[in-house]
């Protein structure tokens, strides 16, 4: 399974968990133990929120309404 498919699988699991819990759920993505980004899924409006962590800077947050687009963004961040 490619890394991109692994990311999509994790995001689909995040969606399913959020739907069952009825509250926003969050997942972290790391490289060599360093947090690169986190993703929250909001069931109410069916959107993802990507937070990108950069050393020495304030985290940047980006909204996505498409699982494919947020998956590609995460994939690029992890490269």
From Swiss-Prot:
Q: Which SUPFAM superfamilies match?
A: YkuJ-like
Protein's UniProt keywords contain Chloroplast: no
Q: Which UniProt keywords apply?
A: Signal
A Pfam family of the record is DUF1797
According to the UniProt entry, where is the signal peptide? 1-20
InterPro entries per record: YkuJ-like, YkuJ-like_sf
Know the name of this protein? Answer: Uncharacterized protein YkuJ
Q: Which gene encodes it?
A: ykuJ
């Amino acid at each position: 399974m490619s890394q991109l498919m692994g990311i999509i699988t994790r995001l689909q699991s995040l969606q399913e968990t959020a739907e069952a819990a009825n509250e926003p759920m969050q997942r972290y993505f790391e490289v060599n133990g360093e947090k690169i980004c986190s993703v929250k899924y909001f069931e109410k409006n069916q959107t993802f929120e990507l937070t990108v962590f950069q050393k020495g800077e304030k985290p940047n947050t980006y909204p996505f309404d498409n699982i494919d687009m947020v998956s590609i963004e995460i994939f690029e961040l992890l490269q």
